[in-house]
Structures are given as structure tokens and as C-alpha cells.
Amino acid sequence: MSLVARRSLLALSIGTALGAADVRAETPTGGRRLALRGYDPVAYFTLGRPEKGEETFSFAFDDAVYRFKTAEHRAMFAADPERYAPQYAGFCAAGVSKGIKVEPDPEAWAIVGGKLYVVAQKEKIDEFKRDPSGFIGKADTNWPVVRESAPKVPAR
């Protein structure tokens, strides 16, 4: 490769990398993952259903950004994030039980033992509910390793 071609390739690579960094820094999540695809984790507990959160009411926790339907929900989460944050950083509990990190469907959920669990598919939530302790036991064992891995399925 000629010197001119190498310099052009280098300039293009640097420009692309800088452009990507700039876009990431400008995102509303500050480069962090948007947990629960923007659904309000407190709503599962207070309303008994999933509700889309608003960008205006956001809170960063555990390398992710959570959104909330109301300022009150944001304040409740900020005061006690361990109480309201979904288990496994909001990744699919069934996936974690199998040793993989998968983005969830926020509408496929269950509260077990006062903790929020989400799974990747609505069809899987009934299976999870039939044997929550089986899924949770395996997921708890796998989570320390799975936590460090990359998600297998990108967010929708």
C-alpha cells in the first residue's frame, strides 16, 4: 500500500472513530445502555404493569439509564434503586439462566420475592412463572460471568 493510501486510510479511520465517539457522547443516555428499553421499573411495582418512561425523568444506575413515567417514580428509584431495578441489570432472566446475556421484552415480566425479572419473549414468561426458583437459581449462579459478557441479541 502506498504512503498516500495509508495516510488516507488512517485519516478516514480516525475521523470515523471520532465521529462515533461524538455521537455516543451526545446520546441522551451518555453512552450507557437504556435499561428496559425505556420502560419505568417503578411502574411494575406501583401500577402492576409496564409503562414507558419519559426521557425527562431519567436516572443512571449500574451502568444503565432508567426512564420513569413521573418525577415521583424517579425519586422513588433514586432513593432505593436496589428495590426497583430489575435483576441481572435488566437482561433476560431466562437467558442469564442459560449463560447468555439477552435484551428483554419489558412486557414479559414477573415480580418474584419482591424483585423484578424480565425475559426476552412473552411466550417465555409463563415458563418462568412455573419454575421461578429454578430459573433464578441458575441465573444467580451464572450472573457473575454473564455480567461481563456482551449481549447476544441487540436491543430493538
Regions found by a protein language model. Name each.
Residues M1-G15:
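N-terminal secretory signal peptides and thylakoid transit peptides that target proteins
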Residues I14-D22:
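Hydrophobic h-region of N-terminal signal peptides that target proteins for export
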